[in-house]
């Protein structure tokens, strides 16, 4: 049984006999600690700093060993604020990596990076803990089944379908709707999905974390009266936390998800918002640890850090983890090292476009930039594949014609091109959809559209049967029948 870095007196007294060090230097969230010769802690061991600050307030800071410096010194990164720490304070080596509670008792609760509950509902009722650092499953354990994960969102299901047990990235700059899309996916999938979900809030707004918690309580995904019946565990390390916490909170959430997959043999949904903040925190820590920065100031170990996290998010013969990750794109530049490194690990990418958002088309998913390894006729079937390709061709032709339209106007186009433009504009509007989680803002009730309905709708537009309808009829509706009904009222 691994020792968990909690602070009951009996444990601490046992630990004190074990291995004691002393703080020699503090630079922001990074501490240098000196130990007795031959008593050096291992890399990733958890250290606990205890004592009182100058005002007499009790201090209890957990750190993680990152470097062994020689001369019996180690460099560690703090998981909480280092206010009040002084040189010479005692540091206890727990002898093990950070361990967090796992299992059914975590459902319905909110945790911080250390696995401590932060929802004022008392301690977690579990004796099972698991270290946050572990290796990825071996090749032989991996599962290679291919099946589609229906989301009820037209643009996603048709053009960049998600794989069950796959990794999905939502890419977008600031304010184009990544978090709203993640909330909608939680709403559509987590409610209909029989298994459990784990949500990792990595370096995002505390307000959004609070909104999500309240929403989950209202929808019954978290059952307040009987916590054991809840379907989701929440792990938060938000924007105000030190970089150490933001760098490790993704691993805490993943460790909880892995337990449900490996031990309970369940299908798990893992939501991470936002994976870019994990990279950003790693970059802050890397500079403080004295590493030479790499491209655009990122850490030189960017690829390794991302790979270590992503390779653990996978499906085995026991169960699956389907992960949906929001990826912030700095300055809308998809070639930035952070989003570019993330791309390599994903089965499907949903790219959000500022251009579409400014047109008022929500979800602002770029139909030509979004990709999926699942969009193959042998997986999705001929009808789906053909429809998706024809939709993309129509939109691509419209994109090519936009310069001509801007200079010469629509009237200068050939009859065929004018028809293509009209259909493309209808398709563009029909790809929008009212969301359940945005009802309070838009006033229109949310819509879930099944895959068969989605394909039928786009086939009708492409066939020309709906050429007589005005394009406004296709804006923010669910299935195609709603569009024809709306046209009758226009």
From Swiss-Prot:
EC main group: translocase
PROSITE patterns on file: ATPASE_ALPHA_BETA (PS00152)
Keyword Cytoplasm recorded: no
Listed EC numbers: 7.1.2.2
A GO biological-process term: proton motive force-driven mitochondrial ATP synthesis
Membrane topology according to the record: Peripheral membrane protein
Coiled-coil regions listed in the entry: none
Keyword ATP-binding in annotation: yes
Family: Belongs to the ATPase alpha/beta chains family.
Assembly mode: F-type ATPases have 2 components, CF(1) - the catalytic core - and CF(0) - the membrane proton channel. CF(1) has five subunits: alpha(3), beta(3), gamma(1), delta(1), epsilon(1). CF(0) has four main subunits: a(1), b(1), b'(1) and c(9-12).
HAMAP family given in the database record: ATP_synth_beta_bact
This protein's name: ATP synthase subunit beta, chloroplastic
UniProt organism field: Medicago sativa
Organism lineage string: Eukaryota, Viridiplantae, Streptophyta, Embryophyta, Tracheophyta
